[in-house]
């Protein structure tokens, strides 16, 4: 296949610099993670949150990467535990007047864009995303202006302002199909922000893609050399990889897919053990979906003392029972999206939703498990 990958170097803020103040600094994000609670404290908070959800006519929507207690609480109260797009869909379609989003800020923004009439709260407004931070709206707009001949396709993990500049928003499971569709129409793509996901999609489709050079703090730390050593220790384990991971990791995958797709693989594939290269928050749902199977965390670069994420997003970890209860009691931490930006951003989201409704397709598994493609029907993001 002829390749048409282009990358560009440009000056932009180092949003992950250790010296930076605020929760965009990784060290500061970890410092904001609430302390562990006793069983008694957790049970008391859960009971309090359940009462507050009813009193506020609110529903809890949580991502697969947040604390297991929050995932369980969402399901126990009629909420939703899913990927970011399904979180927004669920909130849009639910009758609750208040959506409480346990995740990171772009998820709350997307929920607000799709449900502008509803109140959207988050446990901590500082819970952000390295992909979002690494794609500043003004710099991105200038980048787009410099390449007016390209169709702008952005990943869900971006701010509302970046989405407002895009022609399409995609998720990790529908991105392949949308880019293939655009490629067949002869369109050249400007892709942002994740370079690994963009490279993976380009290699699968052959599209002409200009890649923004962003990456996920968690997935970028998975390394092919360490994974190869772990596979030697567990030769019968299947490898599940999120496509935000580096190419050396994706190349070793039995299944490449979004969070929902990897959970489906863990549940449905005939294997007793899986090596999982994505945020370890997903392991709670995988163990629930496949209780008789073993899940092994893929190693990250500099495991233990020197890793930045150690396979868990520090901003996802900022969501906890304590600040969830506080936000329900006070009504603070409300997500606001400028109406003009929201009206512009909703177009690229709706375009993807309409396309997905027509296509009902997903990222295809790689390698030995290609025959299991039918297991991964549906649309869901990171």
Swiss-Prot record:
Name any one Pfam family assigned in the record: NadA
Judging by the UniProt lineage, the source's domain of life is Bacteria
Gene Ontology process terms (BP): 'de novo' NAD biosynthetic process from L-aspartate
Q: Where in the cell is it found?
A: Cytoplasm
Q: What is this protein called?
A: Quinolinate synthase
Q: What organism is listed for this UniProt entry?
A: Ralstonia nicotianae (strain ATCC BAA-1114 / GMI1000) (Ralstonia solanacearum)
Gene name of the record: nadA
Pathway(s) annotated for this protein in UniProt? Cofactor biosynthesis; NAD(+) biosynthesis; quinolinate from iminoaspartate: step 1/1
Q: Which residues are involved in binding [4Fe-4S] cluster?
A: 129, 216, 313
